[in-house]
Amino acid sequence: MASGAPPSVDLTSIQWRMPEWVQSMGGLRTENVLEYFSQSPFYSHKSNNEMLKMQSQFNALDLGDLNSQLKRLTGIQFVIIHERPPFLWVIQKQNRLNENEVKPLTVYFVCNENIYMAPNAYTLLATRMLNATYCFQKALTKIEKFPQYNPQEGYTYPKLSNDNLEVDHSNTNEPADENKNQSIENADYSFSPEDFSVVRAFMQSLHSSKEAPDVK
């Protein structure tokens, strides 16, 4: 039986499985998935589940009896909060304060015999924000070359005509991507005041703090 991972180990980076246990039990089911989970390093032997298992080792509790017993105890518990057998179970580690109140601590997924620890809200939000920032910065880098300055209109943003992107590759040996890049560089731009309104407003706010170019 697993003794749990050391405190210094990042459990969110662990994928755990024990196929020989699953095979010996004839597959995973809702009735035995908590027992399977107890073999993993995510499990705590100081939990109420472990105490009840030791007390009833000669009279195994079914899932209904286990949940009923856990509700009468306070402390750390592991319960199934969602199931879609035979492929998915969601297990919650919680601190039960009383019969009607629990404090969720961590969520785990049992998916195709693999057990994962779900990331916390901070990690999930930080990752999403990092990805969004990267994509936004990449977009700004691409549109940075488009602004055109006019002393009467300020900064304007032209629209690329799709007709100028059609290139005949039948009589050339150059790759299609290279020809497309050349066509974009040599394309004829047309501007509509309604186009890129959001981008235009944002970019104008960036340029407003810069000194306008000298006009002779």
Swiss-Prot record:
Statement: the UniProt record of this protein carries the keyword Nucleus: yes
Pfam families with a match to the protein in the record: Med6
Cell compartments where the protein resides: Nucleus
Domain of life where this protein originates: Eukaryota
Keywords assigned: Activator, Nucleus, Transcription, Transcription regulation
GO biological process, one term: positive regulation of transcription initiation by RNA polymerase II
Similarity comment: family membership: Belongs to the Mediator complex subunit 6 family.
Annotated protein name in UniProt: Mediator of RNA polymerase II transcription subunit 6
Species this protein is from: Schizosaccharomyces pombe (strain 972 / ATCC 24843) (Fission yeast)
Gene behind this protein: med6
